[in-house]
């Protein structure tokens, strides 16, 4: 790894150790504290998993880095550390239910503190929503997989007499659209209807909803406060 300093008491940080092959990195958490009792003149250096996944769902899941690699199985109510990542990894992971023909979710960030929602495919339910809660405690980032028992993140309601097509994109301008954005998942909202919705790409830094109605188009930038409420 890069040189580490043990001088700062209370230091909590991540440590990256390259593999011998050079294509993977081991991620650990480092915690430095004063010793207690007979160790009071010493500094206690603790190494812990940097990323710890806790599956609070009632069924086993597989988790894998979105850049590729072998999936890791996590049983119901089991905690499993994720140690190895690709070099220059964006720390995006994806999930699949065990025995679900490995239909993977959209990538999500295990580095961004907060909550995101993912759609998973289950045999008895085509749209199964789960919550991913990412929190940091000491040098470890805890990623909890939780059943989503409340309302969906968004409810889109079309109170007009026109059919509305909407989709998520990562940019508001045609010139900046990615290859994914040129063929996005599209949803049709019939007149006087409503639809539950969760982001198709929750790992995107910028989240836009592109609306199409009667040949007109408008992009709305979503923020945690509010989106622009003037669609056309």
Regions found by a protein language model. Give the residues of each.
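Asparagine-centered strand-capping/turn motif at beta-strand->loop junctions
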Residues: 54-57, 157-160
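A short, solvent-exposed loop/turn motif at the edges and junctions
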Residues: 1-8, 97-107, 111, 123, ...
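Hydrophobic beta-strand residues in large extracellular and virion-surface proteins
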Residues: 63, 93-97, 132, 156, ...
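Eukaryotic basic, amphipathic alpha-helical target segments in cytosolic regions
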Residues: 34-36, 55, 61, 65, ...
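Conserved small/polar residues in nucleotide/adenosyl-binding loops
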Residues: 222-227
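Short, ordered, surface-exposed loop/turn motifs in non-cytosolic proteins
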Residues: 59-68, 162-179, 232
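Tryptophan-paired
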Residues: 1, 66-99, 174-217
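Compositionally biased low-complexity segments at domain edges in trafficked proteins
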Residues: 21-48, 126-155
């Amino acid at each position: 790894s890069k040189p580490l300093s043990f001088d700062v008491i209370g230091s909590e940080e991540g440590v990256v150790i390259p593999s011998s092959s050079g294509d993977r990195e081991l991620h650990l958490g480092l915690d430095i504290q004063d010793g207690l009792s007979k160790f009071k003149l010493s500094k206690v250096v603790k190494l812990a998993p940097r990323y710890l996944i806790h599956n609070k769902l009632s069924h086993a899941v597989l988790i894998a880095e979105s850049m590729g690699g072998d999936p890791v199985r996590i049983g119901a109510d089991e905690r499993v550390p994720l140690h190895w990542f690709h070099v220059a990894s964006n720390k995006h992971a994806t999930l699949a239910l065990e025995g679900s023909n490995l239909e993977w979710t959209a990538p999500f960030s295990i580095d961004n503190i907060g909550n995101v929602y993912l759609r998973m495919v289950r045999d008895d339910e085509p749209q199964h929503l789960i919550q991913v809660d990412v929190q940091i405690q000491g040098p470890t980032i805890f990623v909890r997989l939780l059943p989503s028992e409340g309302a969906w993140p968004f409810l889109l309601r079309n109170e007009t007499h026109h059919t509305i097509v909407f989709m998520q994109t990562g940019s508001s301008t045609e010139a900046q659209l990615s290859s994914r954005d040129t063929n996005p998942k599209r949803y049709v909202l019939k007149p006087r209807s409503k639809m539950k919705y969760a982001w198709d790409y929750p790992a995107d830094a910028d989240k836009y909803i592109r609306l199409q109605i009667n040949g007109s188009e408008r992009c709305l930038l979503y923020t945690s406060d509010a989106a622009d409420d003037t669609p056309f």
